[in-house]
Amino acid sequence: MEKKHVTVQIQSAPPSYIKLEANEKFVYITSTMNGLSYQIAAIVSYPEKRNSSTANKEDGKLLCKENKLALLLHGSQSHKNAIYQTLLAKRLAEFGYWVLRIDFRGQGDSSDNCDPGLGRTLAQDLEDLSTVYQTVSDRSLRVQLYKTSTISLDVVVAHSRGSLAMFKFCLKLHAAESPLPSHLINCAGRYDGRGLIERCTRLHPHWQAEGGFWANGPRNGEYKDFWIPLSETYSIAGVCVPEFATIPQTCSVMSCYGMCDHIVPISAASNYARLFEGRHSLKLIENADHNYYGIEGDPNALGLPIRRGRVNYSPLVVDLIMEYLQDT
């Protein structure tokens, strides 16, 4: 993997619009290569310290036997605290994990895209993940950021296009003979890129002739309009998903989809199940959409919380992820 100079700056306080738990810190991970620098904004959650003799499976708070990191990745026009990520970070830290949730460049509080004309391409996402991975592989960065000299990346949880980055990055790690995570959790990831092109054409009929389309998303504490160039969309649509099957068998995979997903067809769930047959766990949530909100008229049979007037299935997603990690 490419060598770059990576540094970590732990901030004394987060931006005013970000709330942290007592065990969390807001950080910038800075990468410099060939005279160019960029920053990845992240929140690190430190594990709950508990006496292992008091831990039991019933309370869902088993201490990890080794120092393990969980990395949380968001999707398109999103950020590090989106959907289930804040709650999942809390539960993972209670379980004994270090947790890092990041903003990809062009999103949240991270630096702008390297080339606005290209946008947030998948290649740029992979560069960001390479930078983040160096905080695990470099001993001095491990000590600075995670307060421990030994830690391994054990879990990656990714949503939507973040899942494609997760799987592609594992292929990159494998090619470099670097340690791979043991658990890969795909939340509503796309399987067939043609569906993305069709969706963009349906929502923005002239996007190809115009060279892209406008979207709205979180940027430095505000929702802003920004341009999505053709190259960004095609970098995702052109991914060869079947090659993910070559990820080593040591990586266990879980997929979680809302059965009323309005963005990614539910067929993606069964396609991933077949792709990773023998090491795949599939979870489907009735009445949930792409971001795990209930559809109109959802009876809320589970008594889940309501957010923005809709049933919020994120707590269930987190429960399913934690059950999977306890059982594998």
UniProtKB/Swiss-Prot annotation:
<dbReference type="GO" id="GO:0047372">
    <property type="term" value="F:monoacylglycerol lipase activity"/>
</dbReference>
<dbReference type="InterPro" id="IPR022742">
    <property type="entry name" value="Hydrolase_4"/>
</dbReference>
<dbReference type="Pfam" id="PF12146">
    <property type="entry name" value="Hydrolase_4"/>
</dbReference>
<protein>
    <recommendedName>
        <fullName>Putative uncharacterized protein YDL057W</fullName>
    </recommendedName>
</protein>
<dbReference type="InterPro" id="IPR029058">
    <property type="entry name" value="AB_hydrolase_fold"/>
</dbReference>
<dbReference type="GO" id="GO:0016020">
    <property type="term" value="C:membrane"/>
</dbReference>
